[in-house]
Amino acid sequence: MSGRVGDLSPKQKEALAKFRENVQDVLPALPNPDDYFLLRWLRARNFNLQKSEAMLRKHVEFRKQKDIDNIMSWQPPEVVQQYLSGGMCGYDLEGSPIWYDIIGPLDAKGLLLSASKQDLFKTKMRDCELLLQECVRQTEKMGKKIEATTLIYDCEGLGLKHLWKPAVEAYGEFLCMFEENYPETLKRLFIVKAPKLFPVAYNLVKPFLSEDTRKKIQVLGANWKEVLLKYISPDQLPVEYGGTMTDPDGNPKCKSKINYGGDIPKKYYVRDQVKQQYEHSVQISRGSSHQVEYEILFPGCVLRWQFMSDGSDIGFGIFLKTKVGERQRAGEMREVLPSQRYNAHLVPEDGSLTCSDPGIYVLRFDNTYSFIHAKKVSFTVEVLLPDKALEEKMQQLGAVTPK
């Protein structure tokens, strides 16, 4: 049995009655605590009464702390309204609202430098509540229960800039919040126009997703427009995504409903860096350099780094060893990222690199040009691996876009 209204086993019916009894003290604090609502929490915890109750009580506290009942009257800051991409547009064939997330033009670093993380989270909570309210309206309009949404992730333009560690960590926090407070509200999630980098990005956020959510993700291949039309009527799908819907002015992207983001002008910045913890610290003598080695076993892995120097600038470059098992000078190795000097004492430096060849990669901090000062450098380096199963599936589908 699915554990949904009208499809409950005797055991599940008994669990529902017991659950309602156990949590009756908090039900008045919830917007619409019908059987559909309570079953969402039970399904999310496999009908384990103790875990379901703990989850729901935690959610009630979350609603109080975040003042969720009044969140729709709150307006996000201007920069978030203008540049946080995404939006609700149309309904699928069953009447569920559709939400689009537009990844490519999203300036994640710009948002975190221009707005507080709290305001960004609050905006996403507001979006979740907006979708739930739309489900209620659709339920009344269609005369049947609508309680979940369809998501479309447009991944065209997903690049290394989106792997910036603070941005990935912030997105992970949001996913945890979503899983804990909006269970069973996702019907399906379509990934369209996924580039080669997508399996690496997915592997970073996968730990934050429940097994149930992972099962609802469908990565579509080159025929993604045809697939979407199996679930969505053409008049409910923007022309941009293979349908016939346009804005009143004829815009095929339906920009009145979907925000396409963009690079954030620096005039909006309220800080020049996001605080980070570094895993390593090293003192580099004057006229010297420091090398750290990372073995890359197969193509498609990503090296991601952050570093800061103390008091003065530092040189940084990446090389690929031509001889394994011995230290090589910079001139003896293959240059992958040209060495240059960075003012990492003023603003921490970060970056990432897709490794096209296997081998030993050397990240070299260069202080050879300094005849007087030693430099203290703090840094974190990680090797990001692709989700191999997803990578293989994308290759079979022909899902990969060139970039």
Swiss-Prot record:
Keywords: Activator, Cytoplasm, Lipid-binding, Nucleus, Transcription, Transcription regulation, Transport. Signal peptide: none annotated. It comes from the Eukaryota. GO terms for cellular component: cytoplasm; cytosol; nucleus. SUPFAM superfamilies: CRAL/TRIO domain, CRAL/TRIO N-terminal domain, Supernatant protein factor (SPF), C-terminal domain. The keyword Transcription applies. It is found in: Cytoplasm; Nucleus. The modification N6-succinyllysine is found at K11, K51, K253, K257, K393. The N-terminus is blocked. Pfam families: CRAL_TRIO, CRAL_TRIO_N. GO terms for molecular function: lipid binding. Residues 275-383 form the GOLD domain. CDD domains: SEC14 (cd00170). Residues 76-249 form the CRAL-TRIO domain. Gene3D superfamilies: CRAL-TRIO lipid binding domain, GOLD domain. Carrier protein. Binds to some hydrophobic molecules and promotes their transfer between the different cellular sites. Binds with high affinity to alpha-tocopherol. Also binds with a weaker affinity to other tocopherols and to tocotrienols. May have a transcriptional activatory activity via its association with alpha-tocopherol. Probably recognizes and binds some squalene structure, suggesting that it may regulate cholesterol biosynthesis by increasing the transfer of squalene to a metabolic active pool in the cell. Monomer. This is SEC14-like protein 2. The lineage of its organism: Eukaryota, Metazoa, Chordata, Craniata, Vertebrata.
